[in-house]
């Protein structure tokens, strides 16, 4: 039995006692030997950055509330935790702190685990793992070698950001204004060998599978559909001539709009295209441009926003219908890694081509017009409005200036051109996807070594399974210039497993999305000899996955893809890894700053600022506590280090207790919306916790409650009991179906307020109060488990795991009302209310409504034409 000071709510004492009980009883360890229905709930695993932030707290509290609720409703619940421990931040910290990334990572895990435990999450810690340990990553190494043998993993050249000073590849976010974030060197585009997984082989299945994910937000599914980007079109061949008329390798371009083919006035190719490199050999000016374009962006987003640049190659492409020769241009908005690296340019009907043609004086031809223009302006084609109707797919279009295809609509033109090109061997129908194969190579040290050996005789050879894992050395000196494993000949040099000759290991490591793509399955069998064992099919797919919508595309796409790889390897039976997805909103907070001498801003933490607010809680002024001088108000933004507006969860737990922090994080906003951190709101939750504590102790201090006798209750007692059971019904629905935790808390608060006004000290009055207080403690248990654990004992129910106590169920008989309050309207306007017996007849209700004093006044001089009764709600008297 825990000991708690009677009338004083001491969060630290209460929470320590509850956590000791949970640890001693191994309360949240689960196995598969249960007759209960399973429920697998988890949040996206954290990166061990060193400390939790409020985004973590919100994320993990959401999943913990659902997990505890599901336990109380009779489910066998798995809620695990682990660490996404590889990645770039550890390398950056190693440089800054002059320590090995492994040492930094493991120290952070220890600290963050303690923080998570202080928040009282119902986690099965026996399943914990870190993805940087060999006993975890050996399984993805084994899977990769199997994918190599199946042809699903392959190596080819790809363009990356290269820092020539640090001699390393940079992620896009490490390139700032075209320079390396650390060295300041001008970043180059460099083509280097990279390993890829053939996610494109699964593109259609990934697309079709979205239709089965009814429990995923539509916004996430839409983003994935757009990212997969299925399109149907024609692949068309353009023969190519050099300036001397010699024939070169043909260009193949994919288009979804073959109806615009006669509008092609040039062909655009990527700077890395073989034809561009061929032309540059005899064109120094073009060679210089290609060298300049090496320093540009490599992502679609960057290419979309940068200024259009290009140059004629001197080559020409032969139009496949007209036979006309059109110039071939290098254009910086064409990606070599997308499609064929070549685009048929139709400046009359494509914005990027239009902008490029305008800049370089290239011809622009209209080949599509509206079949039925709505006004005189639409009858005339010009650059100011053609995009509006061309992109409006609901309008009927027809071809013009297109020879024998004039007058055809899109469908007719598509079929005619497809038939022609397929007959002549100049093209074919094709389904294309925007989705690209997943590049999994990273030129970094702190990651899972790619299990490949390079032999001059045998080529790239997968490491034999009996030689796995290829272990990453952890005790290294890390400077940030190059990779320690690349410069370590002892680690790098080995023998070829096929021929026994001298060979070298791959020194690239896996993209860290690899580790986070299968960890959900590993939790089901964390000590299994293989990647997973039969227990995976008991738990998978996970029932609820909680995480930010910013992961909608990359992580969640790779996550689904890797699960299908595991399915095809017969490791799991399910097609999808997760049935339901909840994407929680950001945690935002006020920002404050002062202008810096360098023209920037010095951001000041809200904890260091004294804030003035108006009656609506809006910030009206702020001064720095240290000097009493004003600071600028920056508005509310996502908590971040860059804006210095983060709040330390540990300090909040120390000040208010874990339950209060959990309560505020669930009350301040619905899960999908942004949560504005406001310490005044936390204070409000702390006051509620103290009131609840006092309510329970006051009740218990007045003596033991007798058994409830429903038949003996007075009207007032019935009303309180009805309120209790209405609250039970609402909170259960809010937890289980709606995940609307803020309204669940509000309902319990309303019940608490009603109970505070209920001063009936009779035996049955106290029995009703006992039932209400027990219900409140259980209803709040998923959110405030420590206080609920203590208050359940105070109410005389003994120390037990509340997750094993059934969640309250509303008593239907308690919800029946003896009397109803109806609104009285005259011609639709509210004029009063009446109380009627629940079994009152229509005639009785009509008479009471017309006799209601205020309604009677408005009826003077009028004739009642009819009376409309909405049962249980409204009486509307129509009079004139």
UniProtKB/Swiss-Prot annotation:
Enzyme's top EC category: ligase
Binding site for ATP: 641
Annotated Gene Ontology cellular component terms: cytosol
Gene Ontology MF terms in the entry: aminoacyl-tRNA deacylase activity; ATP binding; leucine-tRNA ligase activity
Localization (cell): Cytoplasm
Highest taxon of the lineage: Bacteria
Reactions catalysed according to its record: tRNA(Leu) + L-leucine + ATP = L-leucyl-tRNA(Leu) + AMP + diphosphate
Alphabetized HAMAP family for the sequence: Leu_tRNA_synth_B
Annotated family: Belongs to the class-I aminoacyl-tRNA synthetase family.
UniProt name for this protein: Leucine--tRNA ligase
Organism in which the protein naturally occurs: Xanthomonas axonopodis pv. citri (strain 306)
């Amino acid at each position: 039995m825990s000991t708690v000071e009677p009338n004083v709510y001491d969060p630290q004492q209460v929470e320590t006692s509850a956590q000791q009980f949970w640890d001693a009883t191994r309360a949240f360890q689960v196995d598969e030997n249960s007759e209960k229905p399973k429920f697998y709930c988890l949040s996206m695993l954290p990166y061990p950055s060193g400390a939790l932030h409020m985004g973590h707290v919100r994320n993990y509290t959401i999943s913990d509330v659902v997990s505890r609720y599901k336990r109380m409703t009779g489910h066998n619940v798995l809620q695990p935790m682990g660490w996404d421990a590889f990645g770039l931040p550890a390398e950056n910290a190693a440089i800054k702190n002059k320590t090995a990334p492994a040492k930094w990572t493991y120290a952070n895990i220890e600290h963050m685990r303690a923080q998570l435990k202080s928040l009282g999450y119902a986690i099965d810690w026996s399943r914990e793992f870190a993805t940087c340990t060999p006993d975890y990553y050996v399984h993805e190494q084994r899977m990769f070698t199997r994918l190599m043998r199946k042809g699903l993993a392959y190596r080819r050249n790809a363009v990356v950001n290269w820092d020539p000073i640090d001699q390393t590849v940079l992620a896009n976010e490490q390139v700032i204004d075209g320079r390396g974030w650390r060295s300041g060197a001008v970043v180059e585009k460099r083509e280097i060998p990279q390993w890829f997984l053939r996610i494109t082989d699964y593109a259609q299945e990934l697309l079709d599978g979205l239709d089965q994910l009814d429990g995923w937000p539509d916004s996430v599914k839409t983003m994935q559909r757009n990212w997969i980007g299925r399109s149907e079109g024609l692949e068309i061949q353009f023969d190519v001539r050099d300036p001397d008329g010699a024939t070169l390798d043909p260009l193949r371009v994919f288009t979804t709009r073959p109806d615009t083919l006669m509008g092609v006035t040039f062909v655009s190719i990527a700077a890395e295209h073989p034809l561009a490199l061929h032309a540059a050999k005899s064109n120094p000016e073009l060679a210089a441009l290609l060298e300049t374009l090496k320093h540009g962006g490599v992502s679609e987003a960057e290419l979309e926003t940068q200024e259009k640049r290009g140059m004629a190659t001197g080559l020409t492409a032969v139009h496949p219908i007209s036979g006309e020769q059109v110039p071939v241009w290098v254009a910086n908005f064409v990606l070599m890694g997308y499609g064929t690296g070549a685009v048929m340019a139709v400046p009359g009907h494509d914005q990027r081509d239009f902008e490029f043609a305008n800049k370089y004086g290239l011809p622009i031809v209209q080949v599509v017009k509206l079949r039925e223009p709505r006004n005189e302006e639409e009858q005339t084609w010009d650059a100011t409005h053609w995009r509006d109707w061309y992109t409006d797919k609901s309008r009927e279009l027809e071809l013009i200036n297109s020879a024998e295809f004039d007058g055809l609509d899109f469908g007719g033109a598509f079929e005619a051109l497809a038939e022609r090109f397929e007959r002549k061997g100049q093209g074919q129908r094709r389904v294309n996807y925007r989705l690209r194969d997943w590049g999994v190579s990273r030129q970094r040290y702190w990651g899972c070594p790619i299990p490949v050996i390079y032999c001059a005789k045998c080529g790239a050879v997968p490491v034999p399974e009996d030689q796995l894992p290829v272990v990453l050395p952890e005790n290294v000196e890390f400077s940030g210039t190059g990779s320690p494993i690349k410069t370590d000949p002892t680690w790098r040099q080995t023998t070829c497993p096929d021929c026994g000759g001298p060979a070298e290991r791959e020194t690239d490591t896996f993209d860290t999305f690899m580790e986070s793509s299968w960890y959900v399955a590993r939790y089901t069998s964390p000590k299994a000899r293989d990647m997973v064992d039969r227990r995976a099919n008991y738990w998978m797919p996970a029932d609820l996955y909680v995480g930010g919508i910013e992961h909608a595309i990359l992580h969640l796409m790779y996550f689904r893809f890797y699960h299908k790889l595991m399915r095809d390897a017969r490791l799991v039976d399910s097609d999808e890894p997760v049935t339901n997805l909840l994407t929680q909103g950001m945690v935002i907070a006020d920002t404050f700053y002062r202008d810096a001498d360098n023209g920037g801003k010095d951001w000041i933490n809200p904890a260091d600022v004294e804030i003035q607010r108006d009656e609506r809680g809006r910030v009206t002024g702020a001064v720095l506590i240290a000097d009493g001088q004003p600071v600028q108000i920056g508005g509310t933004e996502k908590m971040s280090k860059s804006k210095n507006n983060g709040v330390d969860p540990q300090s909040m737990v120390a000040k208010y207790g874990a339950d209060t922090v959990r309560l505020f994080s669930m009350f301040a906003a619905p899960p999908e919306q942004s949560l504005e951190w406001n310490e005044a709101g936390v204070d409000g939750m702390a006051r509620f916790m103290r009131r609840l504590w006092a309510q329970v102790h006051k009740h218990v201090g007045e003596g033991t409650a007798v058994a409830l006798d429903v038949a003996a209750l007075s009207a007032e007692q019935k009303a309180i009991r009805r309120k209790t059971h209405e609250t039970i019904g609402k909170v259960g629905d809010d937890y289980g179906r709606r995940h609307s935790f803020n309204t669940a808390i509000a309902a319990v608060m309303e019940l608490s307020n009603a109970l505070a006004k209920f001063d009936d000290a009779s035996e049955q009055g106290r029995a009703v109060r006992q039932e209400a207080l027990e219900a409140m403690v259980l209803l709040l248990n998923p959110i405030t488990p420590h206080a609920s654990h203590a208050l359940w004992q105070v109410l005389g129910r003994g120390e037990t795991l509340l997750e094993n106590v059934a969640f309250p169920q509303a008593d239907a008989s308690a919800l029946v009302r003896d009397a109803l309050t109806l609104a009285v309207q005259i011609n639709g306007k509210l004029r009063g209310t009446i109380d009627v017996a629940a079994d009152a007849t229509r005639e009785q209700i009509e008479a009471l409504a017309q006799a209601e004093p205020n309604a009677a006044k408005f009826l003077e001089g009028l004739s009642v034409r009819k009376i409309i009764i909405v049962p249980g709600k409204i009486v509307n008297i129509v009079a004139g």
